[in-house]
Amino acid sequence: MTLMTRTLALLTLLLALSLAALPAGASGAVTIGLGDQNWNTFNQPRFAALGLKRVRVVTPWNVALSRGDRAWLDDYLRNVRAAGMDPLVSFGAAHPSHCPARPCRLPTTAAFERAFRAFRQRWPWVRTIGVWNEANHRTQPTFRHPERAARYFNVVRKRCRGCRIVAADVIDDKNMARWLTRFRSVARGARIWGLHNYRDSNPRRGQRYGGTKLLLRTVRGKVWLTETGGIVRFVLPDGRTLFPYSERRANVALGRVLRLARQYRGRIARLYVYHWQQDNFGNRFDAGLLDSTGKPRPSYHTLKRWLDTRWFTR
């Protein structure tokens, strides 16, 4: 064996050993997108500077059958398409549902199927679907009905062959694992699971659990963090402040969730940061990368830096 041959053999062996030593989930890169309800986000220079190609929007489950909602989503998707972006459209409760108060309307499977067929007919180019947003949360009619949510997924899977489907999009509340166990007993062929992991990204003092590791243990397949980020301020409906205003804390939270996604990037395939800019109407939930004047917050610059690392892609 020549010196060159021995050297090449040694390098090959070292490469193999280094790859074997990597922790599970250390391969691949996590795709980052933005969750936002405002279509005018996509023509802003600061948004263009991030180079993002994925966006998530939440819309009523019967959007294609509701004139006002349909017109709004038409405008939104028109701007998404003009910006060359791929939308993830996630369904949720329809007006005038006010869960957990009344009315709290859970559509029948047949009604959901009629609405989804109309959706496919109007927007056939949308091929990335979230079946139901935060389906295990008490503000959703699916809260106590995971089996019904699973039947919605079965409908979407049947009617959208070849689509990327987020089977169950859950928030990391205490009921998450139990809810998913019931969901999985009815769902057929789920491959992508969505999570809003605010307990991991924004842990509170005394909190004993987050949802990401639990979800990874509970389900098989890929996980998309469909809504996450750093909370600047959050006021509860009863007026109590859960998170007082702090851009610094929000920036730390965003870094925390990006490191978590990096750690589990073999399972976590996508991450949608929520949201772009705080509005001028006093929204109770503020996690914007920009403040209400359009000034970038520290979290904007943190996201921009992480996007340029090898662990993440657009």
Model-found features: residue ranges?
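Bacterial N-terminal signal peptides that target proteins for export
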Residues: 1-11
